[in-house]
Amino acid sequence: MMTLDQLKSHIREIPDFPEKGILFRDITTLLKDPNALRESIVHLNRAVYGIPFDYVVAPESRGFIFGMPVAYEMDKGFIPVRKKGKLPAETIAKEYDLEYGKATIEIHKDALKPGDKVVIVDDLLATGGTAKAIKELVESTGATVSKFVFLIELEGLNGKELLGDTPYASVIKY
């Protein structure tokens, strides 16, 4: 079993990416190591164990990497959140603000129904904008968010403030 410090050591730091002054946390080095990948999934699963929920909801693309194995291990369905125009059937959408513009995310209209409970899984909690938009999209169907779970949290950006009163967990904190 890896300690959290050992797991954290598998995340590469890249200064000045994508722009000067940003320290990028690169998970590709964690994904490359089978033990680190396995341990990250174990920690995410622990964060949702015992919580009543029906589905894992996760955004493309890195949310898929971590959300799918959590859904599999917890014997739950997986609902992908995609960028606008990527899902083939009728969708519902949520537009939200980015640092430099706007983005739109979608789920299939029939993916969730009132009373469904979901856990939202993603690789990173930064400003919280994407997580908030996913929560609002889920709630627009009548479903509820039981918990957010993130592999990494950038605490200095205060993303948790946008999660409202929904419980959340993050495995690695910076």
Where do the model's predicted regions map?
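Active-site-facing substrate-recognition patch
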Residues: 1-53, 103
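PRPP-dependent phosphoribosyltransferase catalytic core
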Residues: 3, 132-174
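Short glycine-rich phosphate-binding loop at a beta-alpha junction
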Residues: 53-60
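Conserved acidic residues
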Residues: 54, 116, 146
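Short, glycine/charge-rich flexible loops or terminal/linker lids adjacent to PRPP-binding catalytic cores
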Residues: 77-118
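Conserved G/P- and acidic residue-centered "switch" motifs that form tight phosphate/ATP-binding loops
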Residues: 123, 128
